[in-house]
Curated annotation (Swiss-Prot):
Name of this chain's protein: Probable F-box protein At4g22165
Domain of life: Eukaryota
F-box domain mapped to chain residues: 7-56
A Pfam family it matches: F-box
Signal sequence annotation: none
Length: 363
């Protein structure tokens, strides 16, 4: 008896079955499966894999002929690197300054800023950095230098952070304007808005529509952007070699990173920030800390992640790196540093690398 093969039946699987399959796919297979047909793309928008995935993005060298590509590393698949293509001719000449979900905040050599979705290639251009609303005025001069209203200074775009809604594409981008203040721009803005009383910027994290701000003079603020600005300010003690981190539940932490030359290893101390000062924490519990992103995640929700650990990469800092092409985790329970992965790439490539947590619902 002759069998009737219909080549189109594979795209007509029940939606409930497709939904179950999509929830069990890895990141790369998820992206591949949703591009098969319109039906599968529609299903992909309604579900995400059961576990969050953390990826490290490796940028191409500037002189690479294939400079519109990048590579993705998944710690759960240590022997694989996935290649992303057609990211634009400016991609290799731009630097990633921050990540949120599947989006990258990119800066080119002339300080032009834009947001790029690594999977959909959607690009959003941001206002010129010299377009400022506030007391500090900036003028772009010849050769793309900048002149400040208080005189000539080297331009500093410090520790930018951002948030974007995957569906509406509403966004807010913030960065430190040298020692002067923090500035921000939302969707529809044509200029950067300067935030008063945010001078001597040191570090900041944006989470749940709140900006956690730490100054070099010891001032800690929480600025609420969900409504009109409701500034909450408390004084804290400042230490060197620190990083501001916000936990899953919204608690503010200060993470101190220390180099031990005798053992040629890094060590960390974690402190909870409160109105009375710092409280040392001996454990992150079931959470893992991504130092580059300034956040914690539930380790059980991220493939390949270990609880109570700090994930970090070596970056040039006074020549103290063990190997600038290595990726590490620090276990707070054992107080030991573990080599997570050794990359076959240049120190500059790893220095430019960034962790990101892709959002798979609307990409």
């Amino acid at each position: 008896m002759e069998k009737n093969h219909n080549p189109n039946t594979w795209s007509e699987l029940p939606l409930d079955l497709l939904n179950l399959v999509f929830k069990r796919l890895s990141l790369v297979n998820f992206q591949r499966a949703k591009s098969v047909c319109s039906t599968r793309y529609s299903v992909s928008r309604q579900c995400v894999p059961e576990r969050q995935i953390a990826l490290l993005i490796l940028f191409p060298k500037e002189d690479n002929t294939d400079n519109s590509t990048c590579k993705l590393f998944n710690p759960d698949e240590k022997d694989k690197l996935y290649k992303m293509q057609d990211l634009g001719v400016e991609f290799a000449k731009s630097v990633c300054r921050a990540t949120y979900g599947s989006w990258l905040l990119m800066q080119d050599s002339k300080y032009h800023l834009y947001i790029l979705n690594i999977f959909t290639r959607k690009r959003i251009n941001l206002p010129p950095v010299e377009s400022q609303l506030g007391m500090v005025k900036i003028e772009r001069t010849i050769y793309d230098w900048f002149h400040f209203s208080h005189g000539h200074y080297s331009f500093s775009l410090s520790s930018p952070v951002f948030w974007i809604d995957e569906e509406s594409k509403d966004y807010i981008v913030m960065w430190g304007l040298g020692v002067y203040c923090v500035v921000y721009a939302k969707k529809g803005d044509t200029s950067w808005n300067q935030i008063p009383q945010t001078s001597y910027f040191y570090d900041m994290v944006y989470k749940d529509h709140k900006l956690y701000f730490l100054s070099s003079t010891g001032t800690f603020q929480i600025l609420d952007f969900s409504e009109e600005m409701d500034n909450k300010t408390s004084k804290v003690v400042c230490l060197l070699d620190r990083k501001l981190v916000v936990t899953v539940t919204g608690k503010a932490l200060k993470v101190a990173k220390m180099w031990r030359p005798t053992y040629r290893t890094w060590s960390f101390r974690v402190f909870k920030i409160s109105s009375s000062g710092y409280e040392k924490l001996d454990s992150l519990g079931d959470e893992a800390l991504l130092l580059d992103l300034g956040i914690t995640v539930l380790a059980s929700d991220v493939e390949g992640f270990k609880r109570n650990s700090i994930y970090f990469s070596c970056r040039p800092s006074g020549g103290y790196e063990t190997n600038a092409s290595d990726l590490f985790l620090f276990n707070l329970e054992t107080q030991k540093m573990e080599l997570l992965h050794k990359f076959d790439c240049s120190s500059l490539q790893l220095y430019r690398s960034r962790w990101f947590l892709p959002s798979l619902t609307h990409t």
